[in-house]
UniProtKB/Swiss-Prot annotation:
GO terms for molecular function: aminoacyl-tRNA deacylase activity; ATP binding; proline-tRNA ligase activity. Catalyzes the attachment of proline to tRNA(Pro) in a two-step reaction: proline is first activated by ATP to form Pro-AMP and then transferred to the acceptor end of tRNA(Pro). As ProRS can inadvertently accommodate and process non-cognate amino acids such as alanine and cysteine, to avoid such errors it has two additional distinct editing activities against alanine. One activity is designated as 'pretransfer' editing and involves the tRNA(Pro)-independent hydrolysis of activated Ala-AMP. The keyword Cytoplasm applies. The keyword Phosphoprotein does not apply. This is Proline--tRNA ligase. It catalyses: tRNA(Pro) + L-proline + ATP = L-prolyl-tRNA(Pro) + AMP + diphosphate. Its main location: cytoplasm. Consists of three domains: the N-terminal catalytic domain, the editing domain and the C-terminal anticodon-binding domain. InterPro entries: aa-tRNA-synt_IIb (IPR002314), aa-tRNA-synth_II (IPR006195), aa-tRNA-synth_II/BPL/LPL (IPR045864), Anticodon-bd (IPR004154), Anticodon-bd_dom_sf (IPR036621), Pro-tRNA-ligase_IIa (IPR002316), Pro-tRNA-synth_IIa_bac-type (IPR004500), Pro-tRNA-Synthase_IIa_type1 (IPR023717). Belongs to the class-II aminoacyl-tRNA synthetase family. ProS type 1 subfamily. Homodimer. Coiled coil: none annotated. Keywords: Aminoacyl-tRNA synthetase, ATP-binding, Cytoplasm, Ligase, Nucleotide-binding, Protein biosynthesis.
């Protein structure tokens, strides 16, 4: 491609509404333009990158036998009503009526549509397993779109769906998809982790997320420094290796006036925060379903994990704290609640290992020191209800946990029969009887990958695209840029053009920057866009039969022969 025939839409100034590095650089480098909140145009430079991601994703989906389809973005509401998600999904689902007053939605995902397709096309167990995928735009009416294409309202996604007659078949395809995702993100040169995750609004019973590690990520992920263990902090298991020691103190109430927090009490009593406990009262129910309050107890230095706490059978979902009126009726005072309670008491593992600890005294402005389980208070059940912390033991017994921010770029689910049962999607089994299909769904944020890659790879001059194992998988819109310096002699342009033609013939994605701009402008643009290899052709260097070569990642100038240049740009 010749730059004089290509839209270079670079900007010197950083857009005022671009809030993270990737959104700033994608606009400045001329990859995208914003037309409304959460809505973007992909310019020619950016579309080249998007299409590269799509190609790699498509190749790996086809490698595991997935068949490509294309479903409409507009979906009839009755499909969503069959599964109950028309009302349950929330305001992110854009609902509208056509001119005939029929209800439709703009698809944020396609479980209902693909299940409807399977219901109409699949007849026998002999057709299974089967996997369909598409690469298509989705729409979610985000309340606050931000971070550029990272959290846009309209975005490009690869979504795949598999159908099976049994769980064993689903598990096999799930593993194949997991491996395919690993290959995709490895080919793209991303530093990523696959983590155990919650199934969320999609539903199902097994789930993994794929996260690109970046400080700007919205999710906290925990992973071992010595093994492959990784999990979303929401699900990472907390391990307590400490054993409860015998009591050495008598219990005693002490005055803690205007000290409703563990931090204030620990400082006042000159004790470690980890020797205090906090008691939270939440709404729950008896085994018979009658309303009751329950208590959850954690160490003072730990944070309640809502998702884990919701797994307590007696807790209401979503987890809801007791109201002021409910606390008052129970004779309790927020900030001073103890562990001796006339209700079920669920204690986190770490808190259950404490002895001689400090708790509330169930009396305003008082706490109790020297508290011990069994002697002074009973535990209904020991549970895992806290977030893990940096340095905690890894649950697999190998190493310690590291916690970093991650950008979710992929998510896979074993859905089971949630959608197929709701939509009566069955096939004839080997005994002739109808079998409700098992399903898996597998998503990749194609446009989000680009933002995540930039978050992980940038410097003060612009984008530095990830180093990929194969140059053909590079995300850069062009792998090589040739810059002919202005000269009175035609030799410079002729040589640059000949090199350009030769690289094209070798299959290298090359740009000839023949724009009528100063060299400094060209160099700045190429660094901003992140072209990995830059070759400068000039009178002075041609006199020595040399070319100036610069790699985007080290910017050190090298004078190389033609053969050396070709070796540089075709092997990395």
């Amino acid at each position: 491609m010749k730059a004089s025939q290509f839209l270079f839409a670079t900007l010197k100034e950083t857009p005022s509404d671009a809030d993270i590095a990737s959104s700033q650089l994608m606009v400045r480098a001329g990859l995208i333009r914003k037309i409304a909140s959460g809505l973007y145009i992909w310019l020619p430079m950016g579309l080249r990158v998007l299409q590269k991601v799509e190609r790699i994703v498509r190749e790996e989906m086809q490698n595991i036998g997935a068949q490509e389809v294309l479903m409409p973005m507009t979906q009839p509401a009755e499909l969503w009503q069959m599964t109950g998600r028309f009302n349950d999904y929330g305001p992110e689902l854009l609902r509208f009526k056509d001119r005939h007053d029929r209800d439709f939605v703009l698809g944020p995902t396609h479980e209902e549509v693909i299940t409807n397709l399977a219901q109409g096309e699949l007849r026998s167990y002999k057709q299974l397993p089967i996997t369909f995928f598409q690469i298509q735009n989705k729409f979610r009416d985000e309340i606050r779109p931000r971070f550029g294409v990272m959290r846009a309202r309209e975005f490009t996604m690869k979504d795949a769906y598999s159908f099976h007659v049994d769980q064993a078949s689903l598990a096999k395809t799930y593993d194949d998809m997991y491996d395919a995702y690993t290959r995709i993100f490895t080919r793209l040169g991303l530093d990523f982790r696959a983590v155990q995750a919650d199934t969320g609004s999609i539903g199902g019973f097994a789930s993994h997320e794929f996260h690109v590690l970046a400080d700007s990520g919205e999710d906290d992920i925990a992973f071992s420094d010595s093994s492959e263990y990784a999990a979303n902090v929401e699900l990472a298991e907390s391990v307590c290796t400490a054993e409860r020691q015998p009591a050495t103190m008598a219990r005693e109430n002490v005055d803690t006036v205007n000290m409703p927090t563990c931090e204030a009490v620990a400082e006042y009593l000159n004790v470690e925060l980890a020797t205090t406990v906090k008691t939270l009262i939440v709404q729950g129910h008896t085994p018979e379903g009658e309303p009751q309050l329950i208590a959850v107890v954690l160490r003072g230095d730990h944070t309640l994990n809502t998702i884990k706490a919701e797994k307590i059978e007696e807790a209401n979902v979503p987890l809801t704290m007791a109201t002021e009126e409910e606390l008052k009726a129970a004779g309790l005072h927020k900030g001073y609640i103890g562990v001796e309670l006339d209700m079920p008491v669920f204690v986190d593992r770490a808190a259950a290992a404490l002895s001689d600890f400090v708790s509330g005294a169930n009396e305003v402005n008082k706490h109790t020191i020297g508290m011990n389980w069994e002697r002074d208070a009973n535990i209904t059940r020991i549970v895992d209800i806290r977030n893990v912390n940096q340095g905690d033991p890894s649950p697999d017994g190998k190493g310690t946990l590291q916690i970093k921010r991650g950008i979710e770029v992929g998510h896979i689910f074993q859905l089971g029969n949630k959608y197929s049962q709701a939509m009566n999607c069955t096939v004839s089994g080997d005994d002739g009887k109808p079998v409700t299909l098992m399903m898996g769904c597998y998503g990749i944020g194609v446009s989000r990958i680009i933002a995540a890659a930039i978050e992980q790879n940038n410097d003060e001059n612009g984008i530095m695209w990830p180093l990929t194992p194969n140059i053909s998988d590079s995300l850069a819109p062009f792998e090589v840029a040739i810059v002919p310096m202005k000269s009175k002699e035609e030799t410079v342009m002729q040589t640059a053009t000949a090199l350009y033609d030769e690289l094209k013939a070798l299959g290298v994605n090359v740009l000839l920057d023949d724009r009528n701009e100063r060299p400094g402008v060209k160099f700045a643009d190429l660094e901003l866009i992140g072209i990995p290899h830059r070759i400068v052709v000039s009178d002075r260097n041609l006199a020595e039969d040399k070319y100036e070569y610069i790699n985007r990642r080290d910017t050190e100038k090298q004078l190389l022969s033609r053969d050396e240049v070709l070796a540089k740009v075709s092997s990395k």
